[in-house]
Amino acid sequence: MNDTFSLLQKYTGISKYSKSEVITPQWVVSDMVDLLPQEIFNPDATFFDPAVKSGRFLIEIYNRLMASGLMKQAFPNEQDRHKHIIEKQLFGFATSPTAATVVRKTLYDNPLSTGNIRFTSDKLTKELIQGAFNNMKFDVVIGNPPYNKGMDIDFINLGFELSTKYCVMITPAKWQTAEDNQRIASKMTYGQFRKKIVPHMSNVVFYPDCKDVFDIYQCDGICYYLIDSNNIYDKCKVTNISYNRSYINRVETRSILNRESLWNIGNEIVEYLGDTSKIEMQTGENCRYHVMTNSQLSGYDWFIPEGPRYCLAVSVIVDTKNGESWSGLKTLSFGSDDIKECESFISYINTRFVRFLVAITLSGEIGLPTSNTFRFVPAPPSGKFDHIYTDDELYKDFNLPQKYIDVIEAVVKERK
């Protein structure tokens, strides 16, 4: 079964019904449904989308049910199987009358039939849903809740409370890093959400750059996840993906409360480097040459929505004896009478490796470079600035695993 909304997109150019709506791409819908265990696609399971827009979640589930061996065993006749699925297994609450009509036309032989796709108000509440479906609960709740006004965690909680087995949602990833007592317009604080919902998460897929999924801006990235209503997990499988490349090249299972993010991966790299001696800034106040930079430093919030960033502004060498202007520049506290040493220093701090370690000290800040900015940056293995450094050289010298190299090169822009 193909969704009618895709045909509307193809022939009319409509991408969504209103400016506030975010339509989930089909490939993401498929990936989200993949999180569910195969045994859930059986004749007794019920599936509910609490925020139906395109209908893609319900249509994807319909296709999985039609192809399920358990369903074919119970309903060998294809028409009987179809009838059972649309009458007994698929339920949805639409975000608008238009969305309801489009999805009904896709699912039902009679597009005017209400079926199990309801719309009574655009103000979605637990009471409204229970009233529309006679206090029914569902084995699986899946969808893309509204993001406006920071109410997404309330919708996740709603899905959790309406599900008897699993809840699969795609939402902004702010819940990973927000302060415990923070709330925007939601009833829950992020701390309450993490305490109640996060222990039930068994699988999280995180996109730090929202534009890898949606054509919208979300400064905290986007994630989708499987919530197991009946089980609590000490650890959770977490996958970070950017530009269609996985940060984790093997299955990683860890505590979700670690707030899996580039900050955590940065900490892993720092721990991996261990007690290597750190770079020391030569103030060189009386030296002829000074390495200078402007004040624009950008931390790791960066990478969203614009993708890789430089993280450290361009540095220049100022010849103090020639009276060159320092206007608009701030010192990096490095000086030398040997211009070649300054050039070597600049090549070192311009590597992606060093700029990544600078970025994780900033944690989203923008400000002036200080000696603290470089606190995670190791000194060159030789201890000298005597040649032009490259990333390949440093990766080899510090024996950096490929999984960390992939992270660095995905989020820090090459400087040419």
State where each predicted segment sits.
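C-terminal substrate-recognition regions of SAM-dependent nucleic acid methyltransferases
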Residues: 15, 19, 27, 202-203, ...
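Short acidic/histidine-centered micro-motifs embedded in hydrophobic/aromatic stretches
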Residues: 411
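SAM-dependent methyltransferase catalytic region
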Residues: 1-213, 219-234, 238
